[in-house]
């Protein structure tokens, strides 16, 4: 398959502002692709060469790419560096340079998808002495045979700036349309993706075998399962009404969510909430968890916390992040020792447990987990309908240095990749009006004026709707930034910049600049109000109105979270409703006092 055919589809996707149109282009691309290379097409379309959890990066900066482009086209690197700011996009620069060279070239070989993919794989795996020169030669080799449009997308993929805005869920929609009779099996496809998030492999399976191929996809050691997530409510009483009377109430530790895979021979892999392989920084966790489940093959869902080595107290999450380093691991282990609390069991000795009730998963976990000083079962209470008992346990959890509780339905199954009402967070800050920050995605920006001239004055922020796989605006945020953060912001967001509103963004507000929804920020506001302009919760609380966060303030970037981990539209709606209840109670008290 020639890469030019793929590049033409990419050009159409890049130009569209409609999500359904994007899905249709992808469907046609997938149907025209030989099944044996569909995985490669999918990876390239997502700007990767492998599943994201494999952590394979091309490692090509702009300077290195310009060397390769100069070698391929004969245009001096200095000239390319002069033209780059004028065009403002590495892809457009490569397209321009190759078009200049094409006018003088008569002998080129058609580029195939296989050649592009295999070359980029070699680039990613080039390490050691001479690796940079090898990468330059490899990239120059495919650019030499590239047509101008092909060069545009090769440049963007290589420098990790593809910006098509296609995400895994968009690919699943297109695969469903192409190979699974439209929407009929879309839910099953997503369930399989949630337990085996290698979307290239899944694409190849459904293209070759259709719906029957999905039955072959199971939990596999070394492949992370997308974690189940919790909703939130403000009070013990509401939680009991929602999932009671019988509940499990677990400590919610201020640590890092870890999915730990253990083989019978003691091999261990650790994945973060975002499915990143974080095995290397945690040799202590590997050792004490493997001992605790010795003789078994397991996939555990856990929370790991940093401990004060002198007092044994739980340290804040930010302290644990000092463990995320490539160097000085031994020293970090001594300064920030850890304890891991296991709270769920997804797989045991070849058997998937996702469809077992939490009751049964917990019993099995207690049977196989040989607790030690560092690997422990989560602290929890089984409570049967007693709200006061739940409130007392909540206060106890807070006194013990935790964030609060996660309350769970003992009859619930493990819904991988789903934020459902079977798990509900009860945290200290939910007891008050919007003291709890939310995590929102940057989808646009507005140029600053006066002191902020030359940088962004405010960001357009959005919540995520997993049901629709779109981002809906909830505020314009211009407060809370330091001068240094403001100065750095255009460069920080440059890689995500696009020239039109992204198809997965629902917005009534026109921004000066638009972004692919990737970057997540923590935001704190005064309250949530009805809005005639913002689209979050549109028509769901009141007709012709959405919801907005009033006086939003920037609290920091959440680099540990992806866009799909952001606060959801439903959570914003629930926070608004709970806020109304608090206001009503306060007004009633005031009237009684009067």
From Swiss-Prot:
Alphabetical GO biological process terms: cell division; DNA biosynthetic process; DNA recombination; DNA repair; lagging strand elongation
Disulfide bonds: none
Active site: 252
Gene3D superfamilies: DNA ligase, ATP-dependent, N-terminal domain, DNA ligase/mRNA capping enzyme, Nucleic acid-binding proteins
UniProt entry keywords in alphabetical sequence: ATP-binding, Cell cycle, Cell division, DNA damage, DNA recombination, DNA repair, DNA replication, Ligase, Magnesium, Metal-binding, Nucleotide-binding
Keyword Iron: no
Magnesium found in the keyword field: yes
Binding site for ATP: 250, 257, 273, 303, 343, 419, 425
Family classification: Belongs to the ATP-dependent DNA ligase family.
Described purpose of this protein according to its UniProt entry: DNA ligase that seals nicks in double-stranded DNA during DNA replication, DNA recombination and DNA repair.
Classification via PANTHER family: DNA LIGASE 1, DNA LIGASE 1/3 FAMILY MEMBER
Protein name per the record: DNA ligase 2
Gene of this entry: lig2
